[in-house]
Amino acid sequence: MAIKTYKPYTPSRRYITGLSSEDITAKPSVRSLLVKLPAHAGRNSYGRITSRHKEAGAKKLYRIIDFKRRKFGIEGKVEAIEYDPYRNCRIALIAYKDGEKRYILQPRGLSVGDIVAAAESGLDIKPGNAMKLKNIPVGTIVHNVELKPGKGGQMIRSAGAYAQLMGKEEKYVILRLASGEMRQVLAECMASIGEVGNEEWANVTIGKAGRNRHRGIRPQTRGSAMNPVDHPHGGGEGKKNSGRHPVTPWGKPTKGAKTRRKKASDKLIISRRKGK
């Protein structure tokens, strides 16, 4: 997939880059798989901001994606590759032999006309197929990995993401994530074969503020530009610094300090991600 550049008809277009849409099939989406989601814009049920710098963005319809991949024993044919406004990878429309249609994440190398399937075991190791982790050979690249059997894929779903199956231990398998983290996952969990497509997404330059506004991202104001009542870095004359180590608006250390709480799943992490 190629990166597009634009002629600088306006100053803001000079540095914009985008992705070519040559891989997208020119046909409408399946209406039964579209649903309108309410725009929360970072607010909770009381209307209070719980996630800053968010807004509704451009109007869009959510595509219902099959993250579980538990339609066993029935082959499906890729009918279309489509754009999904809710994610940075493409999605593939699968038409199964029993007449049902579902969307899945498009792995790298999957194209219109290919045949995919899901089963507990016994499938070819090719992009788009899905099996239980215990039956996937060691060394295989996987994506859309479940954390709890039957719950649906929760890890490794964004454009260009992947994990490698490194080994098997009793009821667990060991995955190496792209970050370098080594993690145990239950062997009964499902995973899809291959790397998530649209890997060039990481090289796209947003280029102008309006493009982020369309995506639902509001501007971020520096704490040093605020008043002392609004941020620990606020106040002072001119561009005077705050005189303290960088912190969040609530006083937690930022810029490298670890603030993640311990979770029960920490015991499944064999080695932490490597710093980049």
Curated annotation (Swiss-Prot):
Cell cycle found in the keyword field: no
Biological process, per Gene Ontology: cytoplasmic translation
GO cellular component, one term: large ribosomal subunit
Gene Ontology MF terms: rRNA binding; structural constituent of ribosome; transferase activity
Swiss-Prot/TrEMBL keywords: Ribonucleoprotein, Ribosomal protein, RNA-binding, rRNA-binding
Pfam families: Ribosomal_L2, Ribosomal_L2_C
Role played: One of the primary rRNA binding proteins. Required for association of the 30S and 50S subunits to form the 70S ribosome, for tRNA binding and peptide bond formation. It has been suggested to have peptidyltransferase activity; this is somewhat controversial. Makes several contacts with the 16S rRNA in the 70S ribosome.
Subunit structure, as described in the record: Part of the 50S ribosomal subunit. Forms a bridge to the 30S subunit in the 70S ribosome.
Protein name as annotated: Large ribosomal subunit protein uL2
Organism encoding this protein: Campylobacter jejuni subsp. jejuni serotype O:2 (strain ATCC 700819 / NCTC 11168)
